[in-house]
UniProtKB/Swiss-Prot annotation:
Species per Swiss-Prot/TrEMBL record: Chlamydia felis (strain Fe/C-56)
Annotated Mn(2+) binding sites: K225, H245, D292
Protein name as it appears in the record: Phosphoenolpyruvate carboxykinase [GTP]
Keyword Cell membrane: no
Entries under Gene3D superfamilies matching the protein: 3.90.228.20, Phosphoenolpyruvate Carboxykinase, domain 1, Phosphoenolpyruvate Carboxykinase, domain 2
InterPro entries listed in its UniProt record: PEP_carboxykin_GTP_CS, PEP_carboxykinase_C, PEP_carboxykinase_GTP, PEP_carboxykinase_GTP_C, PEP_carboxykinase_GTP_N, PEP_carboxykinase_N
Active site: C269
Encoding gene, per UniProt annotation: pckG
Amino acid sequence: MTSAWSNEIQHEGLKQWIQEVAELVTPEDIRVCNGSDSEYAEVYSIMQKSGVAIPLNSDLHPNCFLVRSSPEDVARVEKFTFICTAKKEEAGPTNNWRDPQEMRQELQGLFRGCMRGRTLYVVPFCMGPLNSPFSLIGVELTDSPYVVCSMKIMTRMGAEVLKSLGTSGTFHKCLHSVGVPLSPGEKDVAWPCNPEHMRIVHFQDDSSVMSFGSGYGGNALLGKKCVALRLASYIARSKNWLAEHMLIIGVTNPEGQKKYFAASFPSACGKTNLAMLKPKIPGWKIECIGDDIAWIRPGSDGRLYAVNPEYGFFGVAPGTSEKTNPNALATCRSNSIFTNVALTPDGDVWWEGLTSQPPAGLIDWRGNPWQPGGTPAAHPNSRFTTPLQQCPVLDSQWNSSEGVPLEAIIFGGRRSDTIPLVYEALSWQHGVTIGASMSSATTAAIVGEQGKLRHDPFAMLPFCGYNMALYFDHWLSFASNASLKLPKIYGVNWFRKDKDGNFIWPGFSENLRVLEWIFRRTNGEESIAKRTPIGYLPEESSLNLEGLNLSSQALQDLLAVDVPGWLKEVADVREYCKIFGSDLPQIISDELFRIERELK
């Protein structure tokens, strides 16, 4: 192994770590990534030669390729995702905890020799704008070319980051391997992975990540969920900021007044659709800062400011269409990676929901000829990885080092009953209780059962890097700082169904009508809302429903306070919160009691 790579690195601590890792994992070669387009093309051609990357029709999707993963490696694996803290209580009841010393020993065993016959890529990345006080720098060491190409799209990656790191800057150590060493002369498989031994491990003592056995998205692109949420949420608590699973949008009304909102939904509940919403109501404009992660800090003026630490979108493909999200389709037209979607005979991509009828002659996500009526042609959690800057409705402040001031925070989930279309929290404490009470029908973004209701507080259940009860407490602490001008908090639910099981609300671009009401509320319009035990609900006449074919009964159903339903909801949340024991903040118990008392 030559040491030519070490000449490219001025940071002694980084050099030493790479050397230590190389001695453990014994790669054939080491390559420091510079993030250039030519490097991307070269690494992509390696993937093409190995058979994992299929170039798409360059007239339809220039500089795009399709990747098929192993059927055993298609989503985040929560049961193999661990948080290591000195004490189990620090990780809390919602995380898989392991003792850091024991886990390090176990991982040493797994990583020993795991990159034999492969290249170790050094991937320096920055979450957040370079040189922003918000940002965190990481270095991912990986043996996956797919990770290298994806990290170029999803993060600010390469030589600029190394330059910013200097000779002594702080960085997060992120070690990743697909976990499949190659013997001399052994032919590689298209998508190497090691499902028996998958581990995605977060060490909070030194803010590092080690991931083994999976090459898929959130398990392997360690800047995303691992650093930007699981590590960052832990860091944020001690430094008085928030790392959240939220989209960020700019909303401009016909008068030209602009406000920024953040919104939190569990995976596959429409974050990307809302982040890129195309308004049908004349004069309104929605612009996107991010669709998945928000880092939020108090600014010098007391308002909360948000940045998107990411540089790309990693969107769920199925259901994305010209009707549901034309801006997403425009974004991933070029320079994008498609994973586990179907392939058409003319070299284009397809997935369920893209068109009403599937084209003939599809090859499915497993690489087999596909016939309608059987299993889906595209995997339900198939993805597009695409640059942020290609979004046609990208907000001008997308790269602001200070972030944008939030005027509303929105919590939502996939609920067929009880939860109304929109309601406003009576206070910050009530708003935190709304976030803590979130539950949603599960989707394909996680391995396991789909369609059952699971509690997902703040949509952070899989991503909070410490005890969630202490996380609630951290949110509540913002109210005790009198100098802060906190945003209003809202609950929304696009997914209410009628007795025949049909969605009552049309959703998608029509969700702007709800954002319009929220916008007016943040302007202090009192007469458009009425106080109820569960929050301020819209007066029926205050929602702009012009051009919508919505019956008065449907509107009543969407805005009703279902007393028996809510009493059951409160009881259910209270039961769930028992897992936190005495760590649960008293304020949340008090809010639940208040809602119950007022309902009765």
